[in-house]
């Protein structure tokens, strides 16, 4: 199960998930000047970040929107980034947030679990119901793939739907999480975690212990750290014995060179930030 590979990466490298949500605005001007086209520039920047953070991160999350926005050249960079990550034996989360059903979802599964855009995990939106998850299950069972499904996100608008009362003292996110946790028990790895994970933001610490206890076999993809206000202490509450989840950081890592005022060595700055993040979370876990 891919869940075991993720667990073991976390044990070895820590919980950091490097977000390659790479906007052209994030790339230092002196680095940009080396390239004549955006596709090569974007991929080269990502490659530098990957090389600098590979051994201090559990995985990489690539947000497809940043590449789609650049058209075919952007998708070429996306493809090349995924290919390079596979070459480096890195675990890849394609942040695509698909949410359709039936034949359409089957095509999404084929597109992102096979071929040019192949990744290890993808993100899904469950709003249409559990049958929006079904087309991905054969890949989980037979092809060592996994999914992270939106459960309780870190954005302000999460309260519009996710926090609505669903009856019996439960909110919508409770119901979604429980259904996914039950389904996930059919796809457990040897370390006790499923290849069906949940996206759970770290910006509501008061709910952390209850969610971690209830969703006992679900690995968490945890956004909200850094730029969205989440702290190491917030994150630690969603983990179990230092595992059971990965913590995404995009801007804080990609733009570390700005805080450190060292654009020439942007990749090394990204590495330092990833190490600092990893160590801060480890310290928070031990407290």
From Swiss-Prot:
Q: Which residues cross the membrane?
A: none
Xref: Pfam families:
OMPdecase (PF00215)
Q: Which InterPro entries match?
A: Aldolase_TIM, OMPdecase_AS, OMPdecase_type-2, OMPdeCOase_dom, RibuloseP-bd_barrel
Keywords for the protein's UniProt record, in alphabetical order? Decarboxylase, Lyase, Pyrimidine biosynthesis
Instruction: Write out the pathway annotation from the protein's UniProt entry.
Output: Pyrimidine metabolism; UMP biosynthesis via de novo pathway; UMP from orotate: step 2/2
What EC number(s) does the entry state?
4.1.1.23
Domain of life, per the record? Bacteria
> Single GO molecular-function term?
orotidine-5'-phosphate decarboxylase activity
Q: Where is the active site?
A: 97 (proton donor)
Q: Which reaction does it catalyse?
A: orotidine 5'-phosphate + H(+) = UMP + CO2
Kind of enzyme, top EC level?
A: lyase
In its UniProt record, which GO terms are filed under biological process? Answer: 'de novo' pyrimidine nucleobase biosynthetic process; 'de novo' UMP biosynthetic process
The record's family statement is: Belongs to the OMP decarboxylase family. Type 2 subfamily.
Protein name, as recorded: Orotidine 5'-phosphate decarboxylase
Q: Which organism is it from?
A: Clostridium perfringens (strain ATCC 13124 / DSM 756 / JCM 1290 / NCIMB 6125 / NCTC 8237 / Type A)
The major lineage groups are:
Bacteria, Bacillati, Bacillota, Clostridia, Eubacteriales
